[in-house]
Amino acid sequence: IPVLPKPLAEVVTNAYLLCRLADTIEDDVALSNQQKSEFHRRFVSVVEGSDNAESFSSALAPLLSSSVLPDEYDLVTNAAKIVRITHGFSIKEQEALIRCITLMCSGMPGFQHNKSLKGLRGLDELGAYCYVVAGVVGEMLTELFCVHCPELRGKRDEMMRLAVSFGQGLQMTNILKDIWDDRQAGTCWLPRSVFVDSDFELEQLDKLYGTEVFKIGIKKLISVSHRHLRD
């Protein structure tokens, strides 16, 4: 962000804060799935301008876990200031931000609410997960770049495709890097379909991580991730 031209840096910084706020809702351990869905819905309405940011913050802040990071708590309590800046951007900039937040807040809960040590079904589901947490951000950034750099507009369609692919590569890298941390949190984002042995179960990964089946599956995921990053 610091290397971007100032007008673009301002809107990208604001977009980052909006995404962080959406993540804060999703990651808070004290909120039920129903509460998360409701606050995600309200947050989208706040960003769109059809709900009051102060009432949103006042309702959400007292419900956050005592373990929430101070910076994340400040994001929630200062949502009105953040969104006020959002609403000062151009229509096209606001449209890009609203689309990203809407897709993220509507897509993340389905995965988060069903997360378990069983992992995802296959590569298609993994791709869908990567899209709602990373691909939509890449699309938003592409739209903003095209707004601020008119010479890029002729390449927009190709850049949008590459943004989704690169986002998946980055998210898959995070998934592979965080396998054991995610497992401690009761989560696994690995796709079951790449582990071809019918007896291999991701729930038993602490016992099976040294098997050839696991090694082959991980190598395949690394290859897929690398291909997306090379795009």
What are these regions (language model features)?
Residues I1-R230:
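Acidic catalytic motifs of isoprenoid enzymes
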